[in-house]
Each structure stands twice: as C-alpha cells, then as structure tokens.
Amino acid sequence: GVFISSAIQGPGVVKQMGGTGQLFFGPVDRADVEKYRPIEALLQDAGIKAELSADALLPLWTKYIFIGPMAGVTSLTGKPFGEVLGSPDDRVLVEGMMKEIEAVARKKGVNFPADIVQASLGKAAAFAPATKTSMQLDYERGNPTELDIFIAYMVKAGKELGIPVPLHRKVYAELMMR
C-alpha cells in the first residue's frame, strides 16, 4: 500500500500534494519475507519510506480502512480532508464506515490493532487540510472512478459475510446517482 496524496498534472508529471509518502509491502507467503529485505533496503537507500511486512494483508487493509471512507465521503460531499474531518456529521460518517470495514476485515482474518479506527482518523488528520482523494478528483473531472474498489466492494463483502454495512450502501447509492 502507498500513503500519498498526488495528482496527475499532465503527461509524465505527477505532483505530490501531501501525505506521509510511505510504501508498505510484503509477500503473499510470510515465509518469504526475508527474500524481500533487499528491496526494502534499496527503497530506503533511495530515500523512500518503505516498510516490509510479513503479513501483507495487514498493511493492505490498513490503507483500505483509511482511504475507502475518505474517498467515499470526500467524493460525496465535494469537501477536502480538513472540511470533512471538521464537520461533525461527515466525521461520524467516515468513522462509521471505518467501523464497517473493520468488522468485515476482522471476519476475513485481518488482525488489526484495537485502535485501528482512531489511528486511521489520525492518519487522515495528518494530511494537509486541502487534500482531495483521487476518487474525488476523478468525480470532479468526470473521469472513471474507484467507486467499485472503495465502496461497492464493501457492500458486496458485507452481504457475503452477513455483516451489515448500511453506511457503505448509502454512500454507494448516492454516488451511483452522479
């Protein structure tokens, strides 16, 4: 997973606008983790904040629990991170969506820390207040979006696992009307 806020400015030009600029990666089979140490060292030597994880699902879901709700709510409201987190209603929606993802991920065997939702909200607050998600920018520009990845997937997973995800259903329905 990658934690960064960036946008395509033109052909061959990507502008980083904020975020921690971190890269998390790992093998599918945790027994292979040591084979990836040279890649981690190479990235770190190049000045990239890279972290190798023996449990590749944990960093993947850690990014998902953060970016899915932020992408959904910023796209729905048209507000950047700072305004979403500063609005009590929007913040409650983001937090509720994070809790829905936590329930689905735990059912799938992801071993989140107990404070994953609060940590994810803190991660969002660390971004520049004017930060927009790539999905929000895609909606603004009329481009194809990541709605299926960030929101529809949770609706489907919740249904398959018997876990209620009413907030994801609501956001999905509203964004589908755009």
What are these regions (language model features)?
Residues 1-13:
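Rossmann-like NAD(P)(H) cofactor-binding subdomain of soluble oxidoreductases
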Residues 7, 74, 149:
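Active-site-proximal flexible loops/turns
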Residues 13-63, 68-115:
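Internal alpha-helical scaffold of NAD(P)-dependent oxidoreductase catalytic cores
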Residues 34, 44-45, 83, 93-178:
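NAD(P)-dependent Rossmann-like dehydrogenase/reductase catalytic/cofactor-binding core
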